[in-house]
UniProtKB/Swiss-Prot annotation:
Residues reported to bind ATP: 12-19
Name of the protein this chain belongs to: tRNA dimethylallyltransferase
Originating organism: Stutzerimonas stutzeri (strain A1501)
Site positions per UniProt: Interaction with substrate tRNA: 103, 125
Subunit structure: Monomer.
Source organism, top-level taxon: Bacteria
GO biological process, one term: tRNA modification
MF-aspect GO terms: ATP binding; tRNA dimethylallyltransferase activity
Length: 323
């Protein structure tokens, strides 16, 4: 049995039932929940993120939910720092950290660490975002391909956040993101060094998803249409009315929010907005599956199974996660 304290990762694509299973686990285990979701960090973004209700959050508090205003940004490095601090507090209290969500980059940051990249530069970022707005994202991708073909091959031409960040790193430091990562690998940092990727926990990794992809697609469509019925458009209208938010911000680029925002801008009809939101959510799920297929040892659970809780508990017991 490992001398390291236990932790549980509960991963899966959007609309797979992660939250429901997490709550079931929290009812029977001495654990505390930590959200691993880049959209749930934002206050006032509740319907479109499928955020647990206020009653649920009161009964089962989630760390790293509602910690930021939508005008703020939040990086994987910041998440990793916050999550590690929360995990340490939970462990010190004699409980088990249960990390649940679908932002796979955040899980990766915890497991493997992040390259030591230069800090963001607001002026450089503003210039790059202005260039993208005036000439299109393809111009940014072409520029990145010239200086850092490895990153350009990895980053989709329609991914503004990662394109801007990769170019920002180069403009600020004179080194490409690929060069920074290569330097980190060559340094072979010790196990206690920042970013070394050694998580000081015995981690059990659970993943929940429907066994059949078309089932997930149907769930995504039902959920998105239900969100619209529950007031998703009005939620985005309230965000727009503030006057300090725009489509270039990470919060508003979140899946669903972008499509509703564009609808309110007059770029689509209501039904087109719904269809685009469903398609964007399915594309997100596909990307999440891509991450998960390349992940390490993961115990898979079928969303439609009626015995996921005992299956999960049996797996955790087999790893000596449960005493």
């Amino acid at each position: 049995m490992s001398s390291l304290p236990p932790a549980i990762f509960l991963m899966g694509p959007t609309a797979s039932g992660k939250t429901d299973l997490a709550l079931e686990l929290a009812r029977v285990l001495p654990c505390e929940l930590i959200s691993v979701d880049s959209a749930l960090v934002y206050r006032g973004m509740d319907i479109g993120t499928a955020k647990p209700s206020a009653d649920v959050l009161a009964q089962f508090p989630h760390r790293l939910v509602d910690i930021l205003d939508p005008a703020e940004s939040y990086s994987a490095a910041e998440f990793s720092s916050d999550a590690l601090a929360a995990m340490a507090e939970i462990t010190a209290a004699g409980r088990i950290p249960l990390l649940v969500g679908g932002t796979m980059l955040y899980f990766k940051a915890l497991q493997e660490g992040l390259a030591d990249m230069p800090a963001a530069d607001a002026s450089v970022r503003a210039e790059l975002e202005a260039l993208a707005a005036s000439e299109g994202l393809q111009v940014l991708h072409d520029r990145l391909a010239q200086v850092d073909p490895e990153s350009a091959a990895r980053i989709h031409p329609n991914d503004p956040q990662r394109l801007v960040r990769a170019l920002e790193v180069y403009c600020v430091s004179g080194l490409t993101m690929s060069e920074h990562r290569a330097r980190q690998r060559s340094q072979k940092a010790g196990p206690d060094a920042p970013g070394s990727g050694v998580l000081p926990y015995t981690v059990a990794q659970l993943c929940i998803a429907p066994a059949q992809r078309h089932i997930l697609h149907e769930r995504i469509e039902r959920r998105f249409r239900h969100m619209v019925e529950q007031g998703f458009v009005e939620e985005v209208e309230a965000l727009r009315s503030r006057g300090d938010l725009h489509l270039g911000m990470p919060s508003i680029r979140a899946v669903g929010y972008r499509q509703v925002w564009e609808y309110l801008d007059g770029s689509s009809t209501r039904e087109e907005m719904v269809e685009r939101g469903i398609i964007a959510t399915r594309q997100l799920a596909k990307r999440q599956f891509t991450w998960l297929r390349s992940w390490g040892e993961v115990h898979w659970l079928d969303s439609l199974s009626c015995d996921n809780l005992p299956r999960a508990l049996k797996y955790l017991q087999s790893l000596s996660i449960l005493s």
